Amino acid sequence: MTDKTSLSYKDAGVDIDAGNALVGRIKGVVKKTRRPEVMGGLGGFGALCALPQKYREPVLVSGTDGVGTKLRLAMDLKRHDTIGIDLVAMCVNDLVVQGAEPLFFLDYYATGKLDVDTASAVISGIAEGCLQSGCSLVGGETAEMPGMYHGEDYDVAGFCVGVVEKSEIIDGSKVSDGDVLIALGSSGPHSNGYSLVRKILEVSGCDPQTTELDGKPLADHLLAPTRIYVKSVLELIEKVDVHAIAHLTGGGFWENIPRVLPDNTQAVIDESSWQWPEVFNWLQTAGNVERHEMYRTFNCGVGMIIALPAPEVDKALALLNANGENTWKIGIIKASDSEQRVVIE
């Protein structure tokens, strides 16, 4: 025998009991997201999911993302209940622009010291995002890593798999001269540009919890969860000939719209067709941000842009509005050999 103290994993900063308590806390909300194709429950070494039988030539579509430094703002303000929705939204919105129906989602939650209440709030938000998008939360990893993160700081990442009929993949190849562009309004900055947001808050000396904008704290505008467009867009795709969809994330208008444009086409955006939500006006003014930089960093009130034939526009707007989306005609596609793929005028 030795007089040395017997060390445990908990002494090293990893509390397995806290991890088990978290699993017990989240089981109920995770179960609500279950799709009929999912086989087995939580706790297996891998999650099993069958393909929906309605697909003749199913193609799997995958995506992974995080929420950037919006997470830092959420931690600073101690508001953890909606950041999980952001995480799901960033993944599933990227899938649906290709016509894919999200099937299942997995998350990765890493922290220096596991706080069960905080982690439970985040994962409950992830489950809510999965409910909004119709996909199952089938598993995840909670990693308590002392020395890797400061205190109870945490990071999250998500991974999603969806499915689309091979013949119905939306890849922008059908976009042509004369197509109309319609916009789907955003709920705010979504999950992009937050390093600039935080810099503006720092330089301006503004407290987002006490500064009011449109009758509510600025923090509410900045932490509004990213809108999930999946169910509205999937119904639209079923009933309307959609040529392309762009999800306006990092890179804003200048970089995301060209991703779905064929060669020799140009998107012409009518800046007078909408008014920026006040949060973007505040950011531009408080940070003295140039117009071009605003459109490169933020969505400026536009979460998605959809290209479709002119005769389909009225039907598309009616369908989207009926599903609660804020939509409008934002521009057109023109034939052009210009290197400038997007024009805002």
UniProtKB/Swiss-Prot annotation:
The metabolic or biological pathway listed in the UniProt record of this protein is: Purine metabolism; IMP biosynthesis via de novo pathway; 5-amino-1-(5-phospho-D-ribosyl)imidazole from N(2)-formyl-N(1)-(5-phospho-D-ribosyl)glycinamide: step 2/2
Main EC class of this protein?
A: ligase
Family, as annotated: Belongs to the AIR synthase family.
Species of the source: Shigella dysenteriae serotype 1 (strain Sd197)
What EC number(s) does its UniProt record assign?
Answer: 6.3.3.1
Q: Name one GO biological process term.
A: 'de novo' IMP biosynthetic process
What NCBIfam families does the entry give?
purM (TIGR00878)
Q: What is the lineage of its organism?
A: Bacteria, Pseudomonadati, Pseudomonadota, Gammaproteobacteria, Enterobacterales
Q: Which UniProt keywords apply?
A: ATP-binding, Cytoplasm, Ligase, Nucleotide-binding, Purine biosynthesis
Q: Where in the cell is it found?
A: Cytoplasm
Q: What is the top-level taxon of the source organism?
A: Bacteria
Q: Known CDD domains for this protein?
A: PurM (cd02196)
GO molecular-function annotation terms? ATP binding; phosphoribosylamine-glycine ligase activity; phosphoribosylformylglycinamidine cyclo-ligase activity
What are its GO cellular component terms?
cytosol
Give one Pfam family, short name only: AIRS
Q: What is this protein called?
A: Phosphoribosylformylglycinamidine cyclo-ligase
Enzymatic reactions: 2-formamido-N(1)-(5-O-phospho-beta-D-ribosyl)acetamidine + ATP = 5-amino-1-(5-phospho-beta-D-ribosyl)imidazole + ADP + phosphate + H(+)
